[in-house]
Amino acid sequence: MNLDDLFEQKGEVAKSVLEELEKVMGEYGYNIEHILMVDIIPDDSVRRAMNEINAAQRMQLASLYKGEAEKILQVKRAEAEAEAKYLGGVGVARQRQAITDGLRENILNFSHKVEGTSAKEVMDLIMITQYFDTIKDLGNSSKNTTVFIPHGPGHVRDIGEQIRNGLMESARAGINIERFCISP
């Protein structure tokens, strides 16, 4: 029996001691009724070794729990980040839809109120306005130190032509562009 078993089976040990004492002391006329085993006190070196073993086991268990807790934190952090990105994407999609709806409404209102203007002319005007807004935003950003932007009288027209050419190329390629266009 090892020391751990001795501590666990203290009652069994007391019973064995009682039986042995009854045998030995019975020869002298003594009758043992009960034996009280108060505590088992091992040698100091044995106690220190047992304490070190217990401490090492607790440290190992604590490390395991700490690792599991860190794993759970990382998973929750990743889930929160994924949810934030998803919600950010939903917000951007709604913002773009609102911009598209507003542009469509502005084009229709402007072309109905100002006679002789076509939807293309209104789109060109809106593109110029957005182009200047973009330049202003780039200039106001504190993160930008130098920005090279081709700027000239025909630059906005060139951008408009590039967009129209892209739409025509996609139409020739058979790509459905209706989902990208502003519908009245």
From Swiss-Prot:
Chain ranges passing through the membrane: none
InterPro entries: Band7/mec-2_domain, Band_7, Band_7/SPFH_dom_sf
Name assigned to this protein: Protein PPLZ12
Species this chain originates from: Lupinus polyphyllus
Primary gene name: PPLZ12
